[in-house]
């Protein structure tokens, strides 16, 4: 946590305890911390380097459970405030038990979340208020690629 503060509370905010630091929220984003992060990255590009990782365990049929705990931020190991768990399964038509989103649905969620968060943070950095963001994503799959039945058919999403 202290390591994380080093990267996110640069400049004049660096010496202020988090509890007494002013917070200016725009789109739910702490703009003071965001500005400090931007300045820290400008001053030291190494601060921008992150490595995220998960530990996955197959639990039968199409079910998987991944644990998210630690990551590297600016070359230093840090961890989430709590251990996070991601569950995946396949729908019945793909021989699963349908107890969770399947891996390709998780990919769509990750893409939508990444694009939306990026847009909201960039807007906040520019002083633009956003009232609402909604998106719909879809992807086409052809099981012949996954099953190895047609070498010309791409495995995974088609585009």
Give the role of each language-model region.
Residues 2-109, 119-159:
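Extended beta-strand/beta-hairpin segments
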Residues 111-115:
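Alpha-helical metal-binding/catalytic segments enriched in His/Glu/Asp
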């Amino acid at each position: 946590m202290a390591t994380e503060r080093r990267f996110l509370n640069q400049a004049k905010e660096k010496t202020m305890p988090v509890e007494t630091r002013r917070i200016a929220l725009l789109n739910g984003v702490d703009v003071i911390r965001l500005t400090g992060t931007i300045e820290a990255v400008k001053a030291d590009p190494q601060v921008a380097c992150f490595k995220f990782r998960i530990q996955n365990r197959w639990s039968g049929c199409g079910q998987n459970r991944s644990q998210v705990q630690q990551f590297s931020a600016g070359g230093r190991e840090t961890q989430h405030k709590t251990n996070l768990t991601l569950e995946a399964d396949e729908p019945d038509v793909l021989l699963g038990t349908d107890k969770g989103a399947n891996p390709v649905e998780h990919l769509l969620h990750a893409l939508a979340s990444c694009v939306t968060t990026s847009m909201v943070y960039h807007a906040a950095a520019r002083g633009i208020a956003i009232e609402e963001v909604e998106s719909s994503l879809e992807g086409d799959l052809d099981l012949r690629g996954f099953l190895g039945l047609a070498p010309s058919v791409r495995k995974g999403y088609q585009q």
